[in-house]
Amino acid sequence: MSTSPLVIAIDGPSGSGKSSTSRGVANRLGLARLDTGSMYRAVACRVAHLGIDPTTNPRDAIKVAQSCHLEIDTSAIDDRVVIDGEDVTKEIRDPQTSAKVSAVATIQPVRDALTARMRQVAADRGRIVMEGRDITTVVCPDAQVRVLLVADPAIRVARRQAELGEKVDMAQVIDSIVRRDRDDSTVSTFEEPAEGVTVVDSTHLNLDQVIDAVIDLVPVTLR
């Protein structure tokens, strides 16, 4: 197994399979893993807990992003997230939190603050899979492997509903995906591949096939 630095950057819209794919790739190659979306979700939780409305008071939301103590497990197994001493691992996946994320994630200084943290994690870990919306273009544009993971909208909705559980309303899932993609598209161009980014369409692939497709892009000398 290589010890050379390796960053695998995976971008994609909601429900495209980024999390399952990044976890699988990290497991197979023995890499660290960072779900960058969990950083935005954690900040959104903290902002809400402090009673801050980011739409009317973005300045205080920015302060939270810049000064909070954020702990994110980068193992391929655990997704534990702690912000300012509070474990928000479960809360950040709640549909109510999802509805609040865009208001925080679309504030450019918040993105700048968290981007700096993401880059530091990549530098500290050395060999890592990073998933998000703008990893291939903004966070790690020089990553050795850059992937845009896509899937048909119907497939994305079905995957997200399965992830959230049977009790989640389909209309709510569709609204969440459409809203997040629309809002995030105002601050990142994740829907079209940048130069040098490989598109992997997971619509007709199972998870193992998607993982294989990403790993095939990793130079043998870096595996």
Swiss-Prot record:
Protein name in the entry: Cytidylate kinase
Coiled coil, from the record: none
Keyword annotations from UniProtKB, A to Z: ATP-binding, Cytoplasm, Kinase, Nucleotide-binding, Transferase
Organism: Cutibacterium acnes (strain DSM 16379 / KPA171202)
Intracellular or extracellular location(s): Cytoplasm
Organism phylogeny: Bacteria, Bacillati, Actinomycetota, Actinomycetes, Propionibacteriales
Catalyzed reactions: CMP + ATP = CDP + ADP; dCMP + ATP = dCDP + ADP
Location of the region described as Disordered in the Swiss-Prot/TrEMBL record: 1-23
InterPro entries, alphabetized: Cytidylate_kin, Cytidylate_kinase_dom, P-loop_NTPase
GN (gene name): cmk
